């Protein structure tokens, strides 16, 4: 497969390096000149428990890129989706497609820019971190799913899957890509909650006193999905049915235990959200990932007060008015406690 990967960080870099190693014709684009320069000079190095190798892959900044591609993988942070989609548009062939390998419901934004017929959905849940220019940690395997946003199973998504099998042999095609994306939104709300602290994902999810909070967050997101007519899909220990009000009383606990086990197997101990806040000291994807859910929920008369409060607390950490600590997670849990007592 000949493809352009727009965003060569944790997700795009890991995918691009593996595809290059398997013989695919990959070109990378990234906004960080120091990252591009390191890749040009030394190659893109993948490290971690799963694979350690260096891929020689051409890399460019957006302003130096020339050419046109039939397949472009968009792997930027969610809040950069619109600007990235507009920047890549001159490089997309008339019959080409853009695949969103991101967190969130970014296919909606991409479709607005490039057209729905040129937009392909993808769901990736593997663990990776950008460590330094030219170096990516591939910390843990996770689900890899591709699908048309209208639910059809087409030759192009089958071709993408065949290529992505060279990255992960478990890659699949789905007729319900929105189900995976909304499922990740529910799990993602839990990850944002863990990032209010300095605990690892696994340690935070294992804490008994916060489990009712995690369940309530997932329930809010899944209620909005249901209001949109979406049936959420499960992955890597996350079982959406376990968080429904009609689920057996121990179902959510079992799912959380499986999520803890999944995350303990990964060398990536903390979420990208935590890393944005604690290490890179930059804005997170919270508005593009969770803020949009609050807005969709309000429009559907399906309120999400816990999710809205979580967005506020992440903003507090971003602007320096709160610290990442269990006290901040307690501030979110207090709202849930007030709701339960109402």
Regions found by a protein language model. Give the residues of each.
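Rossmann-like NAD(P)(H) cofactor-binding subdomain of soluble oxidoreductases
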Residues: 29, 53-135
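Active-site lid/adjacent beta-loop-alpha segment flanking the redox-cofactor pocket in flavoenzymes
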Residues: 198-213
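NAD(P)-dependent Rossmann-like dehydrogenase/reductase catalytic/cofactor-binding core
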Residues: 215, 219-342
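Short phosphate-binding/catalytic loops that engage adenosine nucleotides
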Residues: 24, 169, 230
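NAD(P)+-binding Rossmann beta1-loop-alpha1 motif at the extreme N-terminus of oxidoreductases
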Residues: 1-51
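Nucleotide donor/acceptor-binding cores
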Residues: 1, 70, 142
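Rossmann-fold dinucleotide-binding core
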Residues: 67, 101-190, 195-199
